[in-house]
Amino acid sequence: MKKLISLVSLFCLSVFLPLSVMGEPIDREAVVKRHRVCTTGTLLKSPAQVGNGKFAFGMDITGLQTFVPFNTLSDWSWHSFPLPEGMRAEDYRPVVVETHGKKIAYELRNPDQPELSEWLTKNPHRYNLGRIGFRLLREDGTEAREIDLGNARQEIDLWTGVVYSRFELNRKEVKVRTVCHPDKDMIGVSIESELLNDGNMSIYLDFPYPDGRYFKHYIGRYDTISGHTSTFEKLAPNSVRI
């Protein structure tokens, strides 16, 4: 009898509990925002990031890549190493693997084409596309380091995709918002600080030369200046093309 009562009780719970839960809508925004990611310092192997599925920009505690050259990634590239002599990309032959009784062609490293397979693995160079950071100066005019920042805090709003960063330098507060365009390979940065007025805060760009590595936390060589060039074209008073 006790066993029967237990079974009946279990049945009632299984029927009425889902009905009661289904009657209350989930506040998805509140649930997501409860899990905002907050940090007070740069995580060297787990940076904050904004992106849209085809483009991604990693950042340090400042909201840009001021102190750490985190990767900027995309599904396109503007550079590839030359193909091995006498080879063409279209000459690659996929590797046929038997899967569940069927022979399927996969784009894996072909042991019969080691050089071409290696080239296809590393090219084109989809990252690191470039580095954007703040040039921060201390009151004595020397370059600031992350240790010079006070009251640093960064929050990733998972619901809106906005990264909020704030810190203090020279007893002045800096507020930064970093976003990524939902459809274009473009980031937007909003900066609020008196440091902009006294010349102790500006923006710098740096473009690394590909180093042939992949699947690494930091990719690109910043000491190979002679390997590539950048040109500036002024489009408007406040607009240039690099």
Predicted regions and their residues:
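Positively charged n-region of N-terminal signal peptides that target proteins for export
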Residues: 1-4
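Beta-sandwich/jelly-roll carbohydrate-recognition scaffolds of carbohydrate-active enzymes
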Residues: 24-242
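A residue-level detector for conformationally permissive "hinge/kink" positions
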Residues: 6, 15, 43-45
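Bacterial N-terminal signal peptides
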Residues: 8-20
